[in-house]
Curated annotation (Swiss-Prot):
Known function: Required for thylakoid formation.
Stated name of the protein: Membrane-associated protein Vipp1
Bilayer disposition of the protein: Peripheral membrane protein
Region spans: Disordered: 224-252
Keyword entries, A-Z: Cell inner membrane, Cell membrane, Coiled coil, Membrane
Family statement: Belongs to the PspA/Vipp/IM30 family.
Organism in which the protein naturally occurs: Synechocystis sp. (strain ATCC 27184 / PCC 6803 / Kazusa)
GN (gene name): vipp1
Length: 267
């Protein structure tokens, strides 16, 4: 049992060492399991031979035991018939067979012990091989994953300089430019419409105010006065006031009206 324990440790150590040093862990692990399978086949053959020898020894033991019993019965028969010499000869044969059977009994006990040990060792080796296969599969999967990851990293590392990636980057920048241009055009179009409506609203307000001013002036009200304010009766024209004073008043009013129009136009 101790020998196979050491063998198992050596196998595991060699397996780990091969995995760490080999260029292709998958092939090395596969070969290691194949070698262990060959050892298992040899051990099974040894167990089979030991069991076969055990069976033959057991058969010989049974045969000699039966023969010894037969010669004992003959010795009894000879004594019953007064054949003492013949009985003595039969007992001598019985003793020889009994001694041989005792030797076979000892040999059989040893063979059974050896066979049992070999069976246990065989089961232990089978378990170790099963463990090695599981570990092999796990390590092979890890090796494949590491290889795939290395290839992926290499591919990703080369994407920065590849023409395909550069084309994607150019197209992305072009799409971004097109989106920005479209957004700017939309904003400008909206600004133009808003500006036109603002001008129309401002012009409408100015026209309304000018019309109101004209109406108030036609009614005799000055700008800024309330329509509800009572109008003073016009004083009688004094014939003594010179005519040029009326002309001057008209000129002042016209000037004020022109100034007001200019201010309205500047709004």
């Amino acid at each position: 049992m101790g020998l196979f324990d050491r063998l198992g440790r050596v196998v595991r150590a060699n397996l780990n060492d091969l995995v760490s040093k080999a260029e292709d862990p998958e092939k090395v692990l596969e070969q290691a399991v194949i070698d262990m399978q060959e050892d298992l086949v040899q051990l099974r053959q040894a167990v089979a031979r030991t069991i076969a020898e055990e069976k033959r020894t057991e058969q010989r033991l049974n045969q000699d035991t039966q023969e010894a019993k037969k010669w004992e019965d003959r010795a009894k028969l000879a004594l019953t018939n007064g054949e003492e010499n013949l009985a003595r000869e039969a007992l001598a044969r019985k003793k020889s067979l009994t001694d041989t059977a005792a030797a076979y009994q000892t040999q059989l006990a040893q063979q059974r012990t050896m066979s049992e040990n070999l069976r246990r060792n065989l089961a232990a080796l089978e378990a170790k091989i099963s463990e090695a296969k599981t570990k092999k599969n796990m390590l092979q999967a890890r090796a494949k994953a590491a290889k795939a990851n290395a290839e992926l990293q290499q591919t990703l590392g080369g994407l920065g300089t590849s023409s395909a990636t550069s084309a994607f980057e150019r197209m992305e920048n072009k799409v971004l430019d097109m989106e920005a241009t479209s957004q700017a055009a939309g904003e400008l179009a909206g600004f133009g419409i808003e500006n036109q409506f603002a001008q129309l609203e401002a012009s409408s307000g100015v026209e309304d105010e000018l019309a109101a001013l004209k109406a108030s002036m036609a009614g005799g009200a000055l700008p800024g006065t309330s329509a509800a304010t009572p109008q003073l009766e016009a004083a009688p024209v004094d014939s003594s006031v010179p005519a040029n004073n009326a002309s001057q008043d008209d000129a002042v009013i016209d000037q004020e009206l022109d100034d007001l129009r200019r201010r309205l136009n500047n709004l």
